[in-house]
């Protein structure tokens, strides 16, 4: 494994790491979580998923001296004017308290009928080869669905138990991982990124 094939993932989220490793490691890229290198996360000051992904990737690359890949993703609910949006992970206040976020989302939608519960996941990815990379690889993908009335399924993470996938009679948390990795916002974004990697960087 050559050094440039090791990529620092600018995240401490093990759920995300599993999805990235499943797709990138067969291509020869070793994924190392930033927390394994004692790198903390910078303050997310961007106004969009893409801005935050670029910010996090540059910071991880600066701290590690290595290639860095950042994901900024979240859920946008139409009835809530796009909330929780870029604040998805800290919607309930404490960053990463998934259960509290799901409870708050259900409460916010308690009077919203089924036909008006449309939502979509977004995933922005940014890969930089060094902290000042003038041409970072970026992609933005989405995944359509709606918000259910209660949690279903034990797979996935985040809002997956509430996110009913358009065209499938199940939540994202009920999908087998190999299916989710193909059709989700992150799966699609990773597919687009790997295409760019194969054609631009190999």
Task: Give, region by region, the residue ranges found by the protein language model.
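Anionic-ligand binding patches
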Residues: 2-8, 14-202
